[in-house]
């Protein structure tokens, strides 16, 4: 991955910059002297008072704008969940590694041992340097030519997870469990030997020589940045329920609910161009209606009215910078389901089309994604523009398919489009859009 752009620090925010008129940085700005002349500043002048100020603000170390501090003022509920996770780790209730999948991911618990979230550290992603799963290491060693997905920005899966949640909230789809970028540290995470030795050394120094140990900025293991997704209860793999529904067809009203929820999944996956959507990484929750005449097994939850909901998890391999055009096509596996052969409903059109047709909404969505993605130290503005170009093309195709009364299956059969933007020289705040079709096709179009 070519990462030639300047690094963007996560410390930066709008408060770090002053967009007003700058004060003169030298005495001559206030006295009109010529360059190189010596000026005596009177006592108490602004220039002299600034000279006596330290170059670095000593209070900044205690500033709440700590890059490793999890603050979510816009979402108090999510912030409280993170507080529970941090409190549990302090009490010795550590996250538990999930042994499924190809990356390091963890069930995070509260003080009572209840699972409250799923944490996926950046450096333990499928292609991260500290991935505890040996399968990707073996693939990189034995078959480097097929290693990775060249259409994706490597090691940004945690941003993709959070970005999918952002798109879900903006479009009001409500099928992605809330996901944000957080910092967590735990003994059960996969750290390098150096980090563990340093942590033990600092703890030993604090115990033996407290005066020395108190000088350390941090005693424990370094926090890891990653995505934290709220855990959803009562859901099972979609593949489980879809097979069940084939044997025991749903009532008409419940089947309608499933279709509407399925269409929301299609909208999300298509816009973010999810390259890893099988029937085993989206979930279904089905609460069966109360029925005293028949005895059903424990998989069925008895309620008064049938309720069916979907949860789109595992969104870490989305937001590509180009459409797949090498070995694999990374298709949407839901396209083979019978629900994909039904025309988009009027409900999903009314929910999505007004937003997608609004240029201001699309611009706001791009800016929100930019603010999220630029948190990564390896953020590349050029790569981000390519990701947005793909997303714009997906939005264009989706809008056209809904207007034309097409089905999700017909949607995925439309030619891939890229919509690039460029500044208009004569107009400072105007942009021109260039639409192009991808002619190159992957070698395996079905895989």
Curated annotation (Swiss-Prot):
It is an enzyme of class 2 (transferase). Residues 48-77 have a biased composition (Basic and acidic residues). Keywords: ATP-binding, Cell membrane, Cell projection, Cytoplasmic vesicle, Endosome, Golgi apparatus, Kinase, Lipid metabolism, Lipoprotein, Membrane, Mitochondrion, Nucleotide-binding, Palmitate, Phosphoprotein, Synapse, Synaptosome, Transferase. Its EC number is 2.7.1.67. PANTHER family: PHOSPHATIDYLINOSITOL 4-KINASE TYPE 2-ALPHA, PHOSPHATIDYLINOSITOL 4-KINASE TYPE-II. This is Phosphatidylinositol 4-kinase type 2-alpha. It is a lipid-anchor. SUPFAM superfamilies: ADP-ribosylation. Its main location: Golgi. It is found in: Golgi apparatus, trans-Golgi network membrane; Membrane raft; Endosome; Cytoplasmic vesicle. Residues 125-127 are annotated as: Important for substrate binding. GO terms for cellular component: cytoplasmic vesicle; dendrite; endosome; growing cell tip; membrane; membrane raft; mitochondrion; neuron projection. It holds the Pfam family PI3_PI4_kinase. It comes from Danio rerio. The keyword Thylakoid does not apply. Residues 1-77 are annotated as: Disordered. Residues 312-332 are annotated as: Activation loop. A lipid is attached at residues 142-143, 145-146 (S-palmitoyl cysteine). Residues 98-104 are annotated as: G-loop. Residues 92-421 form the PI3K/PI4K catalytic domain. Membrane-bound phosphatidylinositol-4 kinase (PI4-kinase) that catalyzes the phosphorylation of phosphatidylinositol (PI) to phosphatidylinositol 4-phosphate (PI4P), a lipid that plays important roles in endocytosis, Golgi function, protein sorting and membrane trafficking. Besides, phosphorylation of phosphatidylinositol (PI) to phosphatidylinositol 4-phosphate (PI4P) is the first committed step in the generation of phosphatidylinositol 4,5-bisphosphate (PIP2), a precursor of the second messenger inositol 1,4,5-trisphosphate (InsP3).
